[in-house]
Amino acid sequence: AQPDQKLTLEFAALRLINVEDMGVSPGGAGAATSGSDVRGVGLVGSIESHLGNATKVKDKKALRNIGPSVTYRLRDASGQAREFQNYMVPVELDGQRVFLAGLRDTPAEPFHYLRIPADESDRIDGWLRLRQALVDPALREKAVMRYATAATPADRPEMAEQLQLTTRRAIGLFAGVEATGLNSQPGPAGLQALGEFVEKNVPAEDRERISQVLLRILNGSLFELLNLSREQAGLARLPLGATTEAFMTQAVLSLSDSFLYPAPVLFELADFKHVQASVFQVAHAQGKTLVYLSAVVLIIGVFQS
């Protein structure tokens, strides 16, 4: 959807209980792949490995209620609608807590899910700040300079300028503002854009090595961008460590997937009030005394038999 496209919001359903099979088959074909190290992600690989079903078929079932969800439709001016299903609380997949934002084009299709990592407060806010910072040219440039300064070896200061250029190109490709070839216009974004750039500009024998270098640079610059967004929100920098690395790995994957998300907005179920009502029908029955008396006689007869 285009940002200026007029869409109509249609509420479809609120489900309080969603029981899903959360079983894990280690190393099996059904295991979720979104928690893998981004440095090992094939740049030309299919997006389906990340933007997929919330749960896959696994060898061992583990049914679990993963909380409330809201379903809604966004309908365009031509009457075409897409259906979305967003969960209220994060779900743990492969040891990573993620928010599931589902979508499908028709009711006959299964939902496919964008997996957004939860921040240290178990909220979606950290990822949203990073997503907004990614489309801000000024913040991207600050992140480039910070990363290049930190990554330049102290004994090789002459590398600083080249590292700045490479970092600027990597994060620009990821943000969709850099062309992937000499004679092309900016087009794809995310990991797909880096993949196209490598295919068009790097000899086949060097592609794997260059891909790894670009991904390390991208990860580092996005980490600086994340901390810049936290500074703007009055938050401290995220410390380096396994938890931060896991968040950044999933953040990079979901940022890449988000460029394929077909809507300019994502609605979050923040709170709701569940009101249950029971209705009892009270009717006046003729001859009720006779009915009650017959019931008493019947009960006495049962105990005396």
What is the role of each PLM region?
Residues 1-305:
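Solvent-exposed, non-transmembrane regions of integral membrane proteins
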